[in-house]
């Protein structure tokens, strides 16, 4: 029955692509995927990294309105990946979702680029000290449509592109599974390299050459990303969508609730198994029964009311297979680990706000004639991240492998844990650097001169920026690996969307934390930890150390979650040259961060 199911899936793939099915995927597809990622990230980051300047200097929007416009866009862009993941996992597949989403994004970028080139689509430039004319309704409509198309495009690209790349390695082939974790490292490396190029070269072009060229280059890069991605079509592994994963999860919950009064069977083998029904959603292996959350197992208890007949597909709202029950268990188990990464994003977010404000008050001259822009300080984070990824992949893994015996060196839970520790050190160091900066300001009588440069080198900030980059190389990639590896096979786009959603929540938590600290640290004399106008009179170091304490508490929470976490147990089917599948049980259920 199981072999027939696999043959059926192969036939579906033949019909889907219109030609005989042959081995696809693997390393040969990586140049297309990485070229797509570099061009796409160069386009997206180059398009938005300096957008606040475009809105204020070209469209003459007030700063608050411009900031709120971009914030609303960012919030929408963080929600649409759930929609894109649903479409990809349910019926469209990842390839077509990425392709059409990229085209939608391309249209939005082209629209805004045209508005930057044609003078009538922008308000007239300001002359001298006169009041600038703000963009009218028609001109703003172009902006809003472009940003909306960008948000919709992001929704299809973000959750699918990284999962699609990982799909190119066959999990049932031991020779390819070891390449999957390597893929995540190099995917993030390509992304970081593109970001580095965007925040330096493209931002400089936008500020010093012109917005037509500054937005035109990212638009062309986006077009090239689509060409590069589509160019590998015949080489890719195209996994057939298996229907809405959300519907299956809800069906398990409803079936378990309906049978909540039943007594649990003593022998798990008496539960409902059906390899033929589960074949489309378990190509990489079947999830086996676990003892945790046994109340959900009641959804797989067969009763007379189910009226189950041989060869008949059951009503899934009343009866679910064990594999589908374990899908829901996997999603629930992932929640606490996934949520633990939110505070790291909160800490990382301070680089673009308060750390940047610190940099503005410090001496940033490399030579008498060249000064590093405060907004380019993130370059040190990106360089540290890229360097760490290379070191991790080429040195760290080989050394760790000798001690752990694991092909990937350490598990993704280990990797996330290391990232948490480094992030704690980064915010701790940031607090001490602020103490040093203010001591120099006091020494030179500059406490009440917020716009005067404090005679202290910006090099003092490099450790905190660099440590955040190292932390991201460990935590963010480990986080992404965790979501992809531990998510049910048919929900990997959705799982990647959850990764982006965690990043979004981390930024929102940062906003909430800043608001609360600003409110409750205010004193009658007007002093505040986070003052509006004079950082020298604030207590920014206290804010950094507050984040340090919160991260330390979060680390304890993470270690507890990792200790009790149960890896999803998969029964993999190897069907190389042998007509009968060889089943290999992956004993992962007792592995944890602490045990390993």
Curated annotation (Swiss-Prot):
It is found in: Membrane. Residues 1-16 have a biased composition (Basic and acidic residues). May act as an efflux-type nitrite transporter. Not regulated by the PII protein involved in the regulation of nitrite uptake into higher plant chloroplasts. GO terms for biological process: gibberellic acid homeostasis; nitrate assimilation. Expressed in shoots, stems, leaves, flowers and siliques. The chain crosses the membrane at residues 27-47, 73-93, 98-118, 137-157, 185-205, 213-233, 334-354, 372-392, 416-436, 453-473, 497-517, 542-562. The gene is NPF3.1. This is Protein NRT1/ PTR FAMILY 3.1. Pfam families: PTR2. Disruption phenotype: Slower growth and delayed bolting. Nitrite accumulation in leaves. Belongs to the major facilitator superfamily. Proton-dependent oligopeptide transporter (POT/PTR) (TC 2.A.17) family. Keywords: Membrane, Nitrate assimilation, Transmembrane, Transmembrane helix, Transport. Residues 1-23 are annotated as: Disordered. The keyword Metal-binding does not apply. It is a multi-pass membrane protein. GO terms for molecular function: transmembrane transporter activity. GO terms for cellular component: intracellular vesicle; plasma membrane.
């Amino acid at each position: 029955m199981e072999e027939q199911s696999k043959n059926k899936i192969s036939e579906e793939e033949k019909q889907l692509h219109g030609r005989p099915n042959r081995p696809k995927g693997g390393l040969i597809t990586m140049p297309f995927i990485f070229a797509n990622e570099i061009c796409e990230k160069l386009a997206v980051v180059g398009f938005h990294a300096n957008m606040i300047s475009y809105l204020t200097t070209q469209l003459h929007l007030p700063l608050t309105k411009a900031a709120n416009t971009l914030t609303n866009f960012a919030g929408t862009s963080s929600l649409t990946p759930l929609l894109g993941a649903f479409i990809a996992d349910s019926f469209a597949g990842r390839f077509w979702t990425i392709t059409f989403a990229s085209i939608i994004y391309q249209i939005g970028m082209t629209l805004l680029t045209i508005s930057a080139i044609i003078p009538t689509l922008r308000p007239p430039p300001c002359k001298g000290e006169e009041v600038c004319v703000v963009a009218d309704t028609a001109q703003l409509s172009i902006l809003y449509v472009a940003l909306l198309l960008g948000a919709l495009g992001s929704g299809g690209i973000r959750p699918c592109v990284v999962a699609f790349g990982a799909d190119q390695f066959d999990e049932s082939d031991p020779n390819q599974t070891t390449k999957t974790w390597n893929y995540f490292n190099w995917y993030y490396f390509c992304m970081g390299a593109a970001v580095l190029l965007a925040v330096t070269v493209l931002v400089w072009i936008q500020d010093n050459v012109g917005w037509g060229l500054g937005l035109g280059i990212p638009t062309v890069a986006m077009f090239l990303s689509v060409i590069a991605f589509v160019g590998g079509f015949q080489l890719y592994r195209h996994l057939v969508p298996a229907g809405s994963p959300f519907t299956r999860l809800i069906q398990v919950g409803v079936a378990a609730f309906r049978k909540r009064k039943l007594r649990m069977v003593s022998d798990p083998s008496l539960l409902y198994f059906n390899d033929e029904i589960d074949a489309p959603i378990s190509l990489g292996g079947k999830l086996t029964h676990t003892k945790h959350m046994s109340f959900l197992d009641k959804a797989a208890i067969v009763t007379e009311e189910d009226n189950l007949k041989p060869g008949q597909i059951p009503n899934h709202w009343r009866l679910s297979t064990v594999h589908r029950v374990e899908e829901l268990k996997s999603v629930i188990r992932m929640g606490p680990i996934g949520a633990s990464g939110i505070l790291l994003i909160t800490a990382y977010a301070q680089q673009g706000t308060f750390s940047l404000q610190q940099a503005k008050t410090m001496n940033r001259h490399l030579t008498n004639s060249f000064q590093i822009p405060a907004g380019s300080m993130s370059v040190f984070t990106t360089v540290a991240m890229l360097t760490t990824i290379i070191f991790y992949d080429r040195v760290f893994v080989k050394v760790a492998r000798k001690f752990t015996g694991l092909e990937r060196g350490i598990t993704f839970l280990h990797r996330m844990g290391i990232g948490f520790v480094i992030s704690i050190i980064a915010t701790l160091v940031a607090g001490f650097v602020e103490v040093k900066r203010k001591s120099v300001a006091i020494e030179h009588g500059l406490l009440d001169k917020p716009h005067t440069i404090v005679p202290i080198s910006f090099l003092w900030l490099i450790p905190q920026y660099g440590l955040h980059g190292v932390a991201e190389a460990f935590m963010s990639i480990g986080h992404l690996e965790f979501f992809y590896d531990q998510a049910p096979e048919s929900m990997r786009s959705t799982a990647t969307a959850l990764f982006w959603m965690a990043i979004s929540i981390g930024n929102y938590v940062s906003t909430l934390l800043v608001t609360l600290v600003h409110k409750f640290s205010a004193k009658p004399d007007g002093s505040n930890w986070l003052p509006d106008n004079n950082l020298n009179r604030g207590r920014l170091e206290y804010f950094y150390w507050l984040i340090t304490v919160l991260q330390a508490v979060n680390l304890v929470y993470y270690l507890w979650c990792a200790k009790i976490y149960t890896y999803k147990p998969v029964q993999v089917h190897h069907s190389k040259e042998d007509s009968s599948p060889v089943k290999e049980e992956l004993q992962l259920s007792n592995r944890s961060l602490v045990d390993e």
